[in-house]
Amino acid sequence: MNREQIANALRQNQVVAYPTEAVFGLGCNPQSESAVKKLLDLKQRPVEKGLILVAPSLDFFRPFVDFEQINDEQLSRLQGKYERPTTWIVPSKSTTPYFLTGKFDSIAVRLCDHPSVKALCELTGFALTSTSANLTGEPPCRIADEVRLQFGADFPVLDETVGDARNPSEIRDLRTNQLFRQG
């Protein structure tokens, strides 16, 4: 499928697969509880774990992130350019839905400059949820055909290429810089 078709599927609260910096991600509209529930069911992922949001700019995160709790140094870190993709755990707004934050008072966000992510966010007007496109026990998909093998020939997949990163993103706490997952 092309970008416009995938954007339409996202607007219709479908779960889609799209390329990111290292692997294909599964994503949906983060403001749609029904879409997020479909995603969690598909991945057999407990809601308590929370989800990552990706977008090309901070503006897409404004509905979810409590920027008043982020100081200038932390904001600079959040906007920094790094050797590897970096996901940051940041304070969430009290209005951010539980189905995104899980059991936490924070949310995971990643500024992503991958052209596919940038285009989908700009076409839809929202950030995307992002979890690796793979079934439990299977390796993450790096090409569109692998997504179709795992999720079926009719699964909505943006047929573009992943970036050059070798590993999924590093995950760090923005306030403490604590490393949760090595990238």
From Swiss-Prot:
What name appears for this protein in its UniProt entry? Answer: Threonylcarbamoyl-AMP synthase
Task: Please provide the record's keywords in A-Z order.
Answer: ATP-binding, Cytoplasm, Nucleotide-binding, Nucleotidyltransferase, Transferase, tRNA processing
**Catalytic activity annotation:** L-threonine + hydrogencarbonate + ATP = L-threonylcarbamoyladenylate + diphosphate + H2O
Entry function: Required for the formation of a threonylcarbamoyl group on adenosine at position 37 (t(6)A37) in tRNAs that read codons beginning with adenine. Catalyzes the conversion of L-threonine, HCO(3)(-)/CO(2) and ATP to give threonylcarbamoyl-AMP (TC-AMP) as the acyladenylate intermediate, with the release of diphosphate.
Keyword Transferase part of the UniProt annotation: yes
UniProt GO MF annotations: ATP binding; double-stranded RNA binding; L-threonylcarbamoyladenylate synthase; tRNA binding
Native species: Haemophilus influenzae (strain PittEE)
Q: Where is the YrdC-like domain?
A: 1-183
Q: Which family does it belong to?
A: Belongs to the SUA5 family. TsaC subfamily.
Instruction: Please classify the protein's predominant subcellular localization into one broad category.
Output: cytoplasm
Quote the PANTHER family the UniProt record gives.
SUA5, THREONYLCARBAMOYL-AMP SYNTHASE
SUPFAM superfamilies from the UniProt entry: YrdC/RibB
UniProt xrefs under Pfam families: Sua5_yciO_yrdC (PF01300)
- Which domain of life does this protein belong to? Bacteria
Q: Which top EC class applies here?
A: transferase
Locations listed in the record: Cytoplasm
Q: Which PROSITE patterns match?
A: YRDC
Record-linked InterPro entries: DHBP_synth_RibB-like_a/b_dom, Sua5-like_dom, TC-AMP_synthase, TC-AMP_synthase_SUA5
